[in-house]
Design a protein with these regions (language model features):
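Nucleotide donor/acceptor-binding cores
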Residues: 2, 119-120, 177
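Phosphate/diphosphate ligand-binding glycine-rich loop within oxidoreductases
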Residues: 2-113
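Glycine-rich adenosine-cofactor-binding loop
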Residues: 8, 100, 110-143, 147-150
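Conserved acidic residues
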Residues: 56, 144, 176-179
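Conserved Rossmann-like nucleotide-cofactor binding loop
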Residues: 154
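Short, aromatic/basic amphipathic alpha-helical patches
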Residues: 158-164
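Short acidic low-complexity segments
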Residues: 164-178
Length: 179
């Protein structure tokens, strides 16, 4: 039976196993999806388990989306650009590949709404693990500016590198097109 995991810390709240196990059972896929709480010092051993094919792949959540990168062999262009990985797989050449599917997920959700983001001003509240991916996607959608508000100034400033100089320091909420 193929084994897949979602890793994070904390991880007890994750509904990913329920969702993935439901669809695997519904589609007669011989696999199991579990959650595992890791600490930073567990990451190298965890990646070894994928390399040794004890685990077929994993989803990555906070706080490991950046922290896992040094243990990977390759990154997709989106993962490289955002320095954020949420999916790990062994590729056909037995290389550990880090993917970022958050970008595509966000883009598809926006496309579903049929809302045009071109030249819109966007306000983001918070700078959590998925925000680099959202900023990257918004820039691809050609927004005019992104305003970010976060509890910690340093984390918000760290995200400036993903903004293509479109992130504003100050803005009035009345000027924002999308919140």
């Amino acid at each position: 039976m193929n084994k897949f995991l979602v890793i994070g810390n904390p991880i007890d709240h994750s509904l990913s196993p329920k969702l993935h196990n439901y669809w695997m059972e519904k589609n007669n896929i011989n696999a199991i999806y579990e959650k595992e709480k890791l600490d930073s010092n567990d990451l190298q051993n965890f990646i070894s388990n994928i390399r040794n094919k004890n685990i077929c792949g994993a989803n990555v959540t906070v706080p490991f989306k950046k922290e896992v990168i040094p243990y990977l062999d390759k990154l997709t262009p989106d993962a490289e650009a955002t320095q954020s990985v949420n999916t790990i797989l062994l590729d056909n050449d037995d290389k550990i590949m880090g993917h970022n599917t958050d970008i595509g997920g966000f883009e598809n959700a926006i496309k579903f709404t049929k809302y045009d983001f071109i030249k819109k001003k966007v306000f983001l509240l918070g700078a959590g693990g998925v925000v680099p991916s959202i900023i990257f996607a918004l820039n691809k959608m050609r927004v005019s500016s992104i305003t970010l508000s976060n509890r910690t100034k340093r984390k918000a400033e760290d995200l400036q590198k993903f903004s293509n100089e479109k992130m504003l320091k100050k803005n009035k909420l009345s000027e924002i097109g999308v919140v």
